[in-house]
């Protein structure tokens, strides 16, 4: 008997699929469509096991849907712009384009052996001029639609990458790629008006029923809707033109506990004082050395500068509050000014304590007396409290009721108005780097800011650039930078900023519907293929990428590039777990960890016998060397083993631990399936009474595997296939029944292990390719179970089981039980004292 050889067979079946055009997406109005998409990768140069798991999940869905009669779109591309390519050019020489396209070629060569059902004819990279040229066309359309504008803004500046970062790209006060501390700088920036859609983006989350609740909650919190009061303090001692200080507060019920007012370092009043006071200028400069994100400001030490100015309380003009410039106030949220109530905000409490300001409680827990506070009392807004310095509503009420009453009262007294605000700010997209999509704008002394003429698109990046010094090479490239105005023909300058790379990934799903179209999308193709039916990717993209994509779909709908139905581009979202691995380390003479690759460790030791410390499984990391190269697994076991293992060991939303023993077990099972198929293909037994039982088992396998795949419970589908393999190997059914069951097995396992499935299908005489075979359907009549399995207990101990027809009389069941070998051994020739048959449940034998 020959042996299963994945290395020899997998490439052969991949060639057969390609030759038959099996995975080419076809616009077929006669068939329902299904669009499955995994978040496309950054071309770093190597795929990892996380990629394998992610793309295998999508592949399982795509293959099953195709078999079920859908016209499937399952594309792949590359999120190819970004700083790593520029960093590589600076560190190693060469050009970002060469580095990027070289990595794409390497990763494509690593992905193809996995046997993914991808329509490679639709492949593109976001750094292709054909792609970013269409992005530039959309930018111009968005300018005309009023969705793009330019203004001076305080931004997060990464001094190492020498570029602007969005707030979301600042992690712990540092740049998300460089790790450098971020500073604040004022620059002229391009913005998308995403904040115009804040309410709509928030409300529409409720329609995304097939998204994880966690992701919807994260987006809702990021959009951050709040209801509050906007009002003005009158000022005392302020410069001319600053007789009022506009404030926004979400807790107007605490107005009677106010002890100070504070403004952002970027507030117009602070800017005015900065120009006339050296001490203010020094303090503001210090504030700007902290990033602009809320996270950065929250973690920084709270500092303030007493301006000497005062504001008058709106309900008592004799009550004056000092005005501070504070480093924790954001200019682009609310009005850039607040009042502080230290008793009910921990940040304000720390600030007031530091600067010796009064702390006046407004409300207390029910049933308590006023005492000096050791910390701020900040109950949930839904909690009922006792207002001791309230001015609206009941004496005892919830915070929510207190806020609503305070807004109503203040409006009735002419003190401000109720306002709904959002944390979500407009999306600053300007980046001072080369390897990104050029912003298609010309600066003309006569005409001002002018969009490039569409017939001149794409505005291509120049190839002859140098990375000898930090900064944006486009600023130093006069033949590219200097141009003529498309409106008047005079000398002009190109915009040298490029777009945030999140723009590139915010519409790629739409481009896949017609990747060679001469416009961003083709209306007919977009109408057929959109929306993405199943989107798959990591939870780390819950806010940035997914929120930006939702905004872009709306912008594309407004500018005529997507149909109205695609306003929410992703019908269903699945966030998969990570692939983890143990960490192996020894320590050097100084006690520092030295990490080792898994292949260098055997039985907890290195090749020289040195024992290693084993750290429990963690996310695979190149720095900690707990990585497994998928190509090594494919060479050793075959692609199907890698696919089977990452799908079988854990629910897909959870992490899966990669182990060598697990991979070996998966490989052994697949070899067992091949041997079983080989044996059945040569069987010649006659039809018999067991055929019906095998047909019923096959029907159950079809039903449960289908349910598992369609419900994203891939591990349960695989568990059923294990069980079906055991059933088939033990069955005494006739040859034709077993061949029929084995062909069904090939169809059911095809989404997970497509190469082995083709081998089995061909071995058992299946017609054509199993990849093109229709998904099997279970006969409903065979799913009705007319038998029951009864456990047999002898003196309370389980001794076996018996399967009988459900309607069998108890007397007939007793005869079969007494004939059972295990029962006979227990009886030892004696008659039982009692034999009790509980219909449909159990048989008890008492001796």
Swiss-Prot record:
GO biological process: leucyl-tRNA aminoacylation
UniProt-annotated binding residues for ATP: 622
InterPro entries for this protein: aa-tRNA-synth_I_CS, aa-tRNA-synth_Ia, Leu-tRNA-ligase, Leu_tRNA-synth_edit, M/V/L/I-tRNA-synth_anticd-bd, Methionyl/Leucyl_tRNA_Synth, Rossmann-like_a/b/a_fold, tRNAsynth_Ia_anticodon-bd
Motif, 'KMSKS' region: chain positions: 619-623
Cysteines engaged in disulfide bonds, as pairs: none
GO terms, molecular function: aminoacyl-tRNA deacylase activity; ATP binding; leucine-tRNA ligase activity
Entry EC number(s): 6.1.1.4
Catalytic activity of the protein: tRNA(Leu) + L-leucine + ATP = L-leucyl-tRNA(Leu) + AMP + diphosphate
Subcellular compartments: Cytoplasm
Keyword Nucleotide-binding: yes
Keywords: Aminoacyl-tRNA synthetase, ATP-binding, Cytoplasm, Ligase, Nucleotide-binding, Protein biosynthesis
Record motif 'HIGH' region, residues: 41-51
Protein family according to the UniProt entry: Belongs to the class-I aminoacyl-tRNA synthetase family.
Protein's name in the database: Leucine--tRNA ligase
Organism, as annotated: Cereibacter sphaeroides (strain KD131 / KCTC 12085) (Rhodobacter sphaeroides)
